[in-house]
Amino acid sequence: MIITEIVRMKTVEGITKDEFIGVVDGLERNFHSRQKGFIDTELLYHDEENEWYMIQHWNSKDDLKEASKKIFIDKDAEDFVKSLDKQSVKMLILPRIATWANTL
């Protein structure tokens, strides 16, 4: 069963949008893409709330949990972890029920 993780977060003071996008790019290339069961990531930004959203898909909840344990100790995730306002981070982990795609 595919698992979707939705993370809402803010960055610490002084990090620009472009800088954070670069940090996330490094995280995806050097950390998430190497984790068992990782499928993909989307990054979104809410201007009015000054919040970032990361949507990820994983092959299983166990794969997601293993990667989540590693993110705080892996050197390839260090810049990402340091850039977050840790009190702002909120996560939802949900099983995919159905998907629809454009078939035209």
What is each residue range found by the language model?
Residues 1, 9-12, 42-49, 53, ...:
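Glycine-rich beta-strand-turn "strand-cap" elements at beta-sheet edges
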Residues 10-22:
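Short, surface-exposed ligand-recognition loops at beta-strand->loop->(often short) alpha-helix junctions
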Residues 15, 49, 62:
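Short alpha-helical
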Residues 18, 68, 103-104:
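Short, charged, solvent-exposed linker or helix-capping segments at domain edges/interfaces
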Residues 21, 53, 72-73:
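Residues in and immediately flanking transmembrane alpha helices
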Residues 24, 28:
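Short amphipathic alpha-helical/adjacent loop interface patches that line ligand
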Residues 30-39, 57-92:
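An amphipathic, aromatic/His-enriched active-site/gating alpha helix that lines ligand/cofactor pockets
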